[in-house]
Amino acid sequence: MQNLTISPLSTLPQVRVLGRCAGTDPLTLFWTGSGIELLFTGSELWVELNADYDTMEPWVSVELDGAWISRFAVNPGTSRMCIFRGAAPGRAKHVRLLKDVQAMSEDPAHLLQVTAICHAGGEFLPLPAPRCRLEFIGDSITSG
């Protein structure tokens, strides 16, 4: 592990928050599919997560350049998950980290937060605007 720079999400305006989330320090991921998306040109990238649960552990999925590369349960407490290291510096890598389970109302202790991005070298680039957007109109189940 190189010397990593630890950056709270609030210091990285290029990181896109996905889903309905409030605040960024820490970013609490409550809903399925909520997460973060970013473009990074460095050689090493880690995500610092905070999790808790009594019976139903939180799971996350990671996509790198459009390919699903990992799915894992997050252990209780604060931990760092390596997204990539030893990657070609200077080339932009497109990363998405998504909560892979639903909100767990049966487990009041269930918690998943992104607390920081840890990185070596490179820079965060602005993401292009999404090609299309969907709007769901419906009852309280659909709209919250």
Where are these regions (language model features)?
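N-terminal secretory targeting modules
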Residues: 1-137, 142-144
